[in-house]
Amino acid sequence: MLVVSSVDLYPGSQEERLPGFTPQFPHLVSCSILDRYPQHTVPWHWHRSVELFYIKSGALIYYTPGGQRLFRAGSGGLVNSNVLHRTRAVETGAESIQYVHLFEPELVTGVSGGVIEQRYVAPLLKARGLELIGLSPEDPVQAETLALLRESYALDETDFGYELELQAVLCRIWAGLARQVQAQLGQTPPAVETASEKIKPMMLYIHAHLAEKLSVEQLAAAVFCSEREYYRTFRACLHTTPGEYIRNVRLQTACKLLRETELAVTEVARRCGLGSSSYFGAQFRQEFGCTPTEYRLKWQNSDIGWQENDSGIPAARGTIMA
């Protein structure tokens, strides 16, 4: 199982890049250590793939344009296709560890245009308001779906027949989810553009022009809306202001460049639109409690390999500072 502590996005986009994802078998399983992400947060992003997840330990909050939901250890759920979302670890005294399946809906539809797709898959993908489906261990029916979810993560990827066994259990999980939300299936989105659809080009423009000085007047004009509508869309979808979103994106991008490149701190600051190295350093210290140089050294000096402990949970052989 791939162990991750950062999210990889396509350049100039908030769409997640999925390493190892192939048309022959469009699936990726991973273990996400939320406490080791910058700000203990997976930033806003989306993917066409469906996201099935299980909280192994700790707790985290899923944010979508429709709101937020807390998931504790033993719970799980599904993020629907193309839904904008982010996650943040919650302090519980235990490390926040999440197991994730990312897969294309075709993995469970079978024949294109067939009964399974038309009756169970497409209606769920298109259902109005189904951004996020939660699974609670306290609900007996949902607990059965959670048991299947745990079973899916226990499968050995090296075993002959793994793909067949995984597909079979994913289909059973999907059946459980479809029954759970059956009353909402068949509700299609309205023809008018929703706030969730409006926010994506706004985000894309910010990422494409991150190194520049950005004003709401400029940003609103770029997507042909009023400043008032621009603020309202950010509040409705991301639950924050444009300015705070830009600041967080710049700091997240700076962390990535410090970890993955040898660029000078001044160049990192320039590429992220964070001004002079002194201003960048002050903003970085305020957010992370260390300077950009200290962050880079702590990261580079960390042993970021992983091993599994006796309980089967990935454990760090060193400490990753974030």
Language model features with spans:
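Generic protein-terminus/edge-of-domain signal
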Residues: 1-76, 82-86, 118, 129, ...
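Residue-level marker of regulatory loop/turn positions in helix-turn-helix DNA-binding domains and
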Residues: 31, 44, 191-195, 208, ...
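Short histidine-centered beta-strand/loop micro-motifs
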Residues: 40-46, 88-90, 111-113, 162-164
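Structural motif
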Residues: 76, 96-98, 209
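An amphipathic alpha-helical interaction segment
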Residues: 117, 123-190, 194-197, 201
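Basic/polar phosphate-binding segments, predominantly the helix-turn-helix DNA-binding elements
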Residues: 176-183, 201-251, 259, 263, ...
